[in-house]
Design a protein with these regions (language model features):
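N-terminal Rossmann-like dinucleotide-binding module
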Residues: 1-46, 69
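Short, Asp-centered acidic motifs that coordinate Mg2+ and/or phosphate
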Residues: 29-30, 72-73, 123
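N-terminal Rossmann-like NAD(P) cofactor-binding subdomain of oxidoreductases
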Residues: 102, 121-123
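Conserved hydrophobic packing residues within short motifs/helices of P-loop NTPase cores
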Residues: 5-7, 98, 125
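Short, conserved SAM-binding/catalytic segment
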Residues: 41-48, 112-120
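Beta-loop-alpha module in the N-terminal Rossmann-like domain of NAD(P)-dependent dehydrogenases
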Residues: 50-116
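Short loop-beta-helix segment that forms the pyridoxal 5′-phosphate
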Residues: 50-51, 123-125
């Protein structure tokens, strides 16, 4: 069983990611969205933590990591312009990424992701 986080829970595609996580026998530990999306979350993973501030999400992920509860994947369903920074955050923390399309908006961001994959050992799937 893999442990997931989700960034961007209120979007159109997020419920499909949540359904796929559940149907494949995995679990969602935490989610983040600037909009209150607890209703969406509760229909799939009522036990998951939920934050509306990225800083709180980061603090939770770091706390879990210190407790030996590292995440396996971050599913990114945030607005397109936030995909690159959210993937950068996950990769820097050694967490593999699943991202909705478009993956990035520029070739520079794509090159950066490749460098981060090599440097931190995590992958964009």
């Amino acid at each position: 069983m893999k442990k997931f986080a989700l960034i961007g829970a209120a979007g159109y595609i997020a419920p499909r990611h949540l359904k796929a996580i559940k149907e494949t026998g995995n679990t969602l530990a935490v989610a983040m969205d600037v909009n209150d999306s607890v209703g969406i979350m509760d229909s799939h993973f009522p036990e998951a933590e939920f934050f509306t501030e990225f800083e709180e999400f980061e603090a939770y992920v770091e706390d879990q990591k210190l407790k030996g509860e590292k995440l396996d994947y971050v599913a990114i369903c945030s607005p397109n312009y936030l995909h690159a920074p959210h993937m950068k955050y996950a990769l820097k923390n050694g967490i593999d990424v699943i991202c909705e399309k478009p993956l990035v908006l520029s070739s520079e961001d794509l090159n950066m992701l490749s460098e981060y994959e090599q440097q931190y050992g995590a992958k964009v799937n």
